[in-house]
Amino acid sequence: MIGNWNYGTGRRKSAVARVFIKAGKGDIIVNGKPIADYFSRETSLMIVRQPLELTNHGQTFDIKVNVNGGGETGQAGAVRHGITRALIDYDATLKPSLSNAGFVTRDAREVERKKVGLRKARRAKQFSKR
């Protein structure tokens, strides 16, 4: 807890989100912009709001987010993870329901590296019999 703000760090792929929440009327600001202006896809907006809707805190908190790295989906996942951790910092009794929904665990999937002699991580050159 920093002042009257609760804090949570979220990560997904190469995106890192620093999330600050405090009691308010439901405003979500991401990198200085309203959330609807920052995330263009409806699915990204849905992903970010999932922990708030699960805990019935949709209009309870003002949320300020700094996020960098990654693409839109990775950033949305990082913000969701950060909001989850900030909610747990605010009220530890929310952890079991958030954990059952799978929001507490960091999604550890990362991009697999490209291997020498292959086109991509696993895609080999086309094989020709003759």
Swiss-Prot record:
Sample GO molecular function, one term: RNA binding
Mark the transmembrane ranges: none
Alphabetically list the UniProt keywords: Ribonucleoprotein, Ribosomal protein
Write one Pfam family the protein is assigned to.
Ribosomal_S9
Which SUPFAM superfamilies is this protein grouped with? Ribosomal protein S5 domain 2-like (SSF54211)
Q: Name one GO cellular component term.
A: cytosolic small ribosomal subunit
Q: Which residues form the signal peptide?
A: none
Protein origin, superkingdom? Bacteria
**Which Gene3D superfamilies does this one have?**
3.30.230.10
Q: Does the keyword Transmembrane apply?
A: no
Q: Which GO terms describe its biological process?
A: translation
Q: Which HAMAP family match?
A: Ribosomal_uS9_B
Q: Which NCBIfam families match?
A: PRK00132.1
Q: Which PANTHER family match?
A: RIBOSOMAL PROTEIN S9 (PTHR21569), SMALL RIBOSOMAL SUBUNIT PROTEIN US9M (PTHR21569:SF1)
Q: Which family does it belong to?
A: Belongs to the universal ribosomal protein uS9 family.
Protein's recorded name: Small ribosomal subunit protein uS9
